[in-house]
Amino acid sequence: MKLLSSIEQACDICRLKKLKCSKEKPKCAKCLKNNWECRYSPKTKRSPLTRAHLTEVESRLERLEQLFLLIFPREDLDMILKMDSLQDIKALLTGLFVQDNVNKDAVTDRLASVETDMPLTLRQHRISATSSSEESSNKGQRQLTVSIDSAAHHDNSTIPLDFMPRDALHGFDWSEEDDMSDGLPFLKTDPNNNGFFGDGSLLCILRSIGFKPENYTNSNVNRLPTMITDRYTLASRSTTSRLLQSYLNNFHPYCPIVHSPTLMMLYNNQIEIASKDQWQILFNCILAIGAWCIEGESTDIDVFYYQNAKSHLTSKVFESGSIILVTALHLLSRYTQWRQKTNTSYNFHSFSIRMAISLGLNRDLPSSFSDSSILEQRRRIWWSVYSWEIQLSLLYGRSIQLSQNTISFPSSVDDVQRTTTGPTIYHGIIETARLLQVFTKIYELDKTVTAEKSPICAKKCLMICNEIEEVSRQAPKFLQMDISTTALTNLLKEHPWLSFTRFELKWKQLSLIIYVLRDFFTNFTQKKSQLEQDQNDHQSYEVKRCSIMLSDAAQRTVMSVSSYMDNHNVTPYFAWNCSYYLFNAVLVPIKTLLSNSKSNAENNETAQLLQQINTVLMLLKKLATFKIQTCEKYIQVLEEVCAPFLLSQCAIPLPHISYNNSNGSAIKNIVGSATIAQYPTLPEENVNNISVKYVSPGSVGPSPVPLKSGASFSDLVKLLSNRPPSRNSPVTIPRSTPSHRSVTPFLGQQQQLQSLVPLTPSALFGGANFNQSGNIADSSLSFTFTNSSNGPNLITTQTNSQALSQPIASSNVHDNFMNNEITASKIDDGNNSKPLSPGWTDQTAYNAFGITTGMFNTTTMDDVYNYLFDDEDTPPNPKKE
């Protein structure tokens, strides 16, 4: 241990026991010998109790009170000082500052006059405080900071030179007119005619890792031939009812911006339509989303409805405003985001949020207003639009345009119910809005405070990440990951949509942590001078903690997405979200891998990073089977950037598919330095004809040793104790620990059973029979589906009646999900197969195929006899002569 001269006094234990301290780090000699906790408290500095010192403190306090009254002339200082939490004081004063000082020029003039009237000593104190930016950042959690820029969310940063197009005026122009375009703008690192993507965007990150767009090749998902594109067929009642059912089943539970009872009454012509153009925009957008949620991008049926919706976007539409238009424009923004029209999505969202503000949706109605249904509809629409604003701004690296919210969060109670203690489809948007609102308060405000002079310090990053995790801990119990398996299983049987909501909230939380820490390390690398890099011990420790937390958040994201894919049926909507969060997370190990290659880091860490990258590649290739073009593009980017490492000797080979000749099934394996256990996956429907069993990184255990490697009894005991379990033995947890840092396994999740409505051309227009049930996700609606054994149609309609039944209040919406059994996949062994446990959960899948807990649990006397007396396979004992 090294003696540190900076330690001024003995450790706490030595001072308490009156012992001579060696003043060593991390432990002094006495504490090390007696196994005591060694802690060095800072030396207490006591102020002198003199009249001169008290007079100086009183004068400083008086000037501070005068400054407070000049900035907040209408506030009661005594009332504010009675508040216990410093964070509450900061939030209150920041909100007051925004309300009182909307005009920045007026605020600047006021502060300039305040500075002129300041005494000379106070101005000198302000200058000294500015010069010591590092000290002020360390004391940021104890001091109250009010900033003009932070309050107004003003962004003073300029566009970097490498982001500039050739033409500074017209070079940012963009065009996304082609509805079948294969280009993804944030994968085009060329800044010309691509729009602006700022710091923190995926395009900026791709530039930093050296992605070259000239090596990128466009690739289309194999589209099924659209046999019939007759507009009358696609506009028929039977077709639109199926697509409407798909929207309400596959998308509405996760974005309940549409009031489904009103939607059904409009669809059934039970209420009058105020504007046919506005209704056609909304209705066709819903049909486009419903078609996309069934077949992804394998057909262009959804494009037909999208083009039909655009045809109604006339000049009259933008000369009016309504709730229907706000909802329709928001859904168009969501849809075009999936269809790789990022700038178009941003434009639709801009129209939507500005129109929502013009309708006053960002403010609550008077307390005397008694209709709670209307109040809740307004809140749901606003918070859906607000959450999308934050997500797009972070994704594209563009400024957040909203600075304040005076409207309450929506209620989690359905319109049919009065009170509820269980989950509803509105819990997702409530917790997402709460998470993003807290994030913008604690990160965006603090980020602009330190702007260009000093980046956010490591301590503040850790505080922000802790605040983000604290929000998730305040969520309802059924949305947290530490809920009991039994309780969660019962909830998922009644509410099958809840599983994806829980996972998506976790992914959003981890993506925000990645965003904060990634931005910190970008500034830390670019703006830190050599003098600032010579930090003290606790600063470097906090930077290391940030690095560990960043890699841990990325790894937890990959593990969580893998866990979800292993235990749930995946739809195109789920696949798109999984691929986005996977790609965002894998950029962290890629950046680390490139940094280590420049600094000649250890091969062990490189192998672990490559293993994680290959795991993501494997998952993306599985997601690509769900007809999502974005997955193919992500795979190309990863393979192009990591090609030098994947082809090197230390790289882990990419997943390959080996076919079993007996049954034609495909099994994917990863070959690497560490053995990765396989565990079964739930059968996927409507994906392909090959049953794929792929390796998951969730379980890492010892590789099984050969059954016969010696002839002694001790060797027999050793081998039998390590023998892999038979199919009749229970699945146990591997006794070895992974070589990399372990991640807390995710708790049990039942398979999420989705009521999908296939929309292939054969299914729509004849030639296929399907057995599907049809329930709408909304609690007050139900569709009646009938199966025809002799006809090709999924829905049998009457000539003189509507295809959809009238809305009916139902206490149980998902009765068809209650009777479904979760079946595990089978392990193929020649011609014999035996199913595993019928109730797979995330935890059992995570710990699958471990070694047996006992020594002879799966051993029979035949095994012992064959081991001892089978001379054909048993080699002679080398010690025996």
Curated annotation (Swiss-Prot):
<dbReference type="InterPro" id="IPR001138">
    <property type="entry name" value="Zn2Cys6_DnaBD"/>
</dbReference>
<dbReference type="GO" id="GO:0000978">
    <property type="term" value="F:RNA polymerase II cis-regulatory region sequence-specific DNA binding"/>
</dbReference>
<dbReference type="InterPro" id="IPR007219">
    <property type="entry name" value="Transcription_factor_dom_fun"/>
</dbReference>
<keyword id="KW-0119">Carbohydrate metabolism</keyword>
<feature type="binding site">
    <location>
        <position position="38"/>
    </location>
    <ligand>
        <name>Zn(2+) 2</name>
    </ligand>
</feature>
<feature type="DNA-binding region" description="Zn(2)-C6 fungal-type">
    <location>
        <begin position="11"/>
        <end position="38"/>
    </location>
</feature>
<dbReference type="GO" id="GO:0006351">
    <property type="term" value="P:DNA-templated transcription"/>
</dbReference>
<dbReference type="GO" id="GO:0000431">
    <property type="term" value="P:regulation of transcription from RNA polymerase II promoter by galactose"/>
</dbReference>
<keyword id="KW-0597">Phosphoprotein</keyword>
<feature type="modified residue" description="Phosphoserine">
    <location>
        <position position="699"/>
    </location>
</feature>
<dbReference type="GO" id="GO:0017053">
    <property type="term" value="C:transcription repressor complex"/>
</dbReference>
<feature type="binding site">
    <location>
        <position position="11"/>
    </location>
    <ligand>
        <name>Zn(2+) 2</name>
    </ligand>
</feature>
<dbReference type="Pfam" id="PF03902">
    <property type="entry name" value="Gal4_dimer"/>
</dbReference>
<feature type="binding site">
    <location>
        <position position="21"/>
    </location>
    <ligand>
        <name>Zn(2+) 1</name>
    </ligand>
</feature>
<keyword id="KW-0539">Nucleus</keyword>
<dbReference type="InterPro" id="IPR036864">
    <property type="entry name" value="Zn2-C6_fun-type_DNA-bd_sf"/>
</dbReference>
<feature type="binding site">
    <location>
        <position position="14"/>
    </location>
    <ligand>
        <name>Zn(2+) 1</name>
    </ligand>
</feature>
<keyword id="KW-0010">Activator</keyword>
<feature type="binding site">
    <location>
        <position position="28"/>
    </location>
    <ligand>
        <name>Zn(2+) 2</name>
    </ligand>
</feature>
<dbReference type="GO" id="GO:0008270">
    <property type="term" value="F:zinc ion binding"/>
</dbReference>
<feature type="modified residue" description="Phosphoserine">
    <location>
        <position position="696"/>
    </location>
</feature>
<keyword id="KW-0479">Metal-binding</keyword>
<dbReference type="GO" id="GO:0005634">
    <property type="term" value="C:nucleus"/>
</dbReference>
<feature type="binding site">
    <location>
        <position position="31"/>
    </location>
    <ligand>
        <name>Zn(2+) 2</name>
    </ligand>
</feature>
<feature type="binding site">
    <location>
        <position position="11"/>
    </location>
    <ligand>
        <name>Zn(2+) 1</name>
    </ligand>
</feature>
<feature type="binding site">
    <location>
        <position position="28"/>
    </location>
    <ligand>
        <name>Zn(2+) 1</name>
    </ligand>
</feature>
<keyword id="KW-0805">Transcription regulation</keyword>
<dbReference type="GO" id="GO:0042802">
    <property type="term" value="F:identical protein binding"/>
</dbReference>
<feature type="short sequence motif" description="9aaTAD">
    <location>
        <begin position="862"/>
        <end position="870"/>
    </location>
</feature>
<dbReference type="InterPro" id="IPR005600">
    <property type="entry name" value="Gal4_dimer_dom"/>
</dbReference>
<feature type="modified residue" description="Phosphoserine">
    <location>
        <position position="712"/>
    </location>
</feature>
<keyword id="KW-0804">Transcription</keyword>
<feature type="region of interest" description="Disordered">
    <location>
        <begin position="723"/>
        <end position="743"/>
    </location>
</feature>
<dbReference type="GO" id="GO:0000981">
    <property type="term" value="F:DNA-binding transcription factor activity, RNA polymerase II-specific"/>
</dbReference>
<dbReference type="GO" id="GO:0061629">
    <property type="term" value="F:RNA polymerase II-specific DNA-binding transcription factor binding"/>
</dbReference>
<feature type="modified residue" description="Phosphoserine">
    <location>
        <position position="703"/>
    </location>
</feature>
<keyword id="KW-0862">Zinc</keyword>
<comment type="subunit">
    <text>Binds DNA as a homodimer. Interacts directly with the mediator subunits GAL11/MED15 and SRB4/MED17.</text>
</comment>
<keyword id="KW-0299">Galactose metabolism</keyword>
<dbReference type="GO" id="GO:0045944">
    <property type="term" value="P:positive regulation of transcription by RNA polymerase II"/>
</dbReference>
<dbReference type="Pfam" id="PF04082">
    <property type="entry name" value="Fungal_trans"/>
</dbReference>
<protein>
    <recommendedName>
        <fullName>Regulatory protein GAL4</fullName>
    </recommendedName>
</protein>
